[in-house]
């Protein structure tokens, strides 16, 4: 009997695992429970909504000239939305330091905190390719440390791949070592937020001949290191077009114009979650707000505040738990015996009001 129960438990666990793109489905993985993605939004989900997106999927889209969709998200609810919309890639970015935690830069966030975000996203998104950022300080010092950090992102964070910022030779070497360890890597060139100390702030790149050439050279170096894709951030459209043409791997643009292989925006930004993003004084010039969720949220919170202050919430329809009138009497008597006369009166008064509203069940 015990053996049968164990077999049944193992079968149930296998059904609940989220298959990763880089490990066989039969591998031991205590991953998150799959969501129902069969009813994914029609605008982009299509017939293949339930099929896992892999690096091979992206290569196929790139080969066919089909744009790749990427959204940066940081938690379970946003991951569920990204998943149901049929987005190709969900990137768990180190920009969580700014968007979620309120820092001025991406530098403060640690690998351990990033792993928490990765796990939350992995529980919510079962269809997209999941890519986790390597935060500043966890991969630059040596290839060994880079590989160790990347392994944690997959094993502990439940990601399919990692992203790292390119530029310095040490970062290119880190990318190469991680790929050689069997982990898919997405590169990142142009404005690399982890290097703002060198760049002098969040400034567009590729606006001079030398800077533009460096963007293309770095992208090519990341491709040579084995990256399956490269993010191009805040570079002029001609520079992004040149990099896209020069590379054999997909480019993902953010503030890089329409000539990239795909596009990425931050979940909070594209939804208009706030009047302006917390991590910017104004909405980034490259960010189109596809919604005005922030206005809806503010309106709902204001209405909640007003209804609480006027005592109109909660009303009868949101006070679902009942107690019979006879039990209220017994409860009041018990309170009086405890010397809590005012509490007994409060209970009786509440019951009387509920009875007027037809809330209180009849005595049995």
Curated annotation (Swiss-Prot):
NCBIfam families: panB, PRK00311.1
Pfam families: Pantoate_transf
Active site positions, chain numbering: 233 (proton acceptor)
Covalent S-S links between cysteines: none
Sequence positions that bind Mg(2+): 94, 133, 165
Transmembrane portions of the chain: none
Family designation: Belongs to the PanB family.
Top-level taxonomic group: Eukaryota
Organelle transit peptide residues: 1-59
Name the record gives this protein: 3-methyl-2-oxobutanoate hydroxymethyltransferase 1, mitochondrial
Organism: Oryza sativa subsp. japonica
Keyword Transit peptide among UniProt keywords: yes
Location in or out of the cell: Mitochondrion
Classification via Gene3D superfamilies: Phosphoenolpyruvate-binding domains (3.20.20.60)
UniProt remark on cofactor binding: Binds 1 Mg(2+) ion per subunit.
């Amino acid at each position: 009997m015990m053996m049968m129960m164990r077999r049944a438990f193992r079968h149930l666990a296998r059904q609940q695992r989220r298959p990763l793109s880089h490990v066989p489905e039969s591998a031991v993985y205590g991953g998150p429970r799959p969501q129902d993605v069969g009813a994914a939004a029609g605008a982009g989900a299509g017939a293949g909504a339930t099929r896992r997106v892999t690096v091979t999927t992206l290569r196929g889209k790139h080969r066919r000239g089909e744009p790749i969709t990427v959204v940066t998200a940081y938690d379970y609810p946003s991951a569920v939305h990204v998943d149901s919309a049929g987005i190709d890639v969900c990137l768990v970015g180190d920009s969580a330091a700014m968007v979620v935690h309120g820092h001025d830069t991406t530098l403060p966030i640690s690998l351990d905190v990033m792993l928490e975000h990765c796990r939350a996203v992995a529980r919510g998104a079962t269809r997209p390719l999941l890519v986790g950022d390597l935060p500043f300080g966890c991969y630059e010092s040596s290839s060994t440390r880079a590989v160790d950090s990347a392994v944690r992102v997959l094993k502990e964070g439940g990601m399919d791949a990692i992203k790292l910022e390119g530029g310095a030779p040490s970062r290119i070497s880190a990318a190469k070592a991680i790929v050689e360890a069997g982990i898919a890597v997405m590169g990142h060139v142009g404005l690399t937020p982890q290097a703002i100390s060198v760049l002098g702030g969040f400034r567009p790149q590729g606006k001079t001949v030398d800077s533009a050439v460096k963007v293309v050279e770095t992208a090519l170096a990341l491709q040579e290191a084995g990256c399956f894709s490269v993010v191009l951030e805040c570079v002029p459209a001609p520079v992004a077009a040149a990099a896209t043409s020069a590379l054999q791997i997909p480019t993902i643009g953010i503030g890089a114009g329409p000539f990239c292989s795909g596009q990425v925006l931050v979940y909070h930004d594209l939804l208009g979650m706030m009047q302006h993003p917390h991590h910017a004084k104004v909405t980034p010039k490259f960010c189109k707000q596809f919604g005005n969720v922030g206005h809806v949220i503010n309106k709902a919170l204001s209405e909640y505040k007003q209804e609480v202050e006027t005592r109109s919430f909660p009303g009868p329809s949101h006070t679902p738990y009942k107690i019979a009138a006879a039990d209220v009497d017994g409860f009041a008597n018990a309170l009086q015996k405890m010397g809590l006369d005012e509490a007994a009166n409060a209970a009786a008064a509440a019951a009387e009001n509920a009875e007027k509203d037809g809330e209180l069940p009849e005595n049995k």
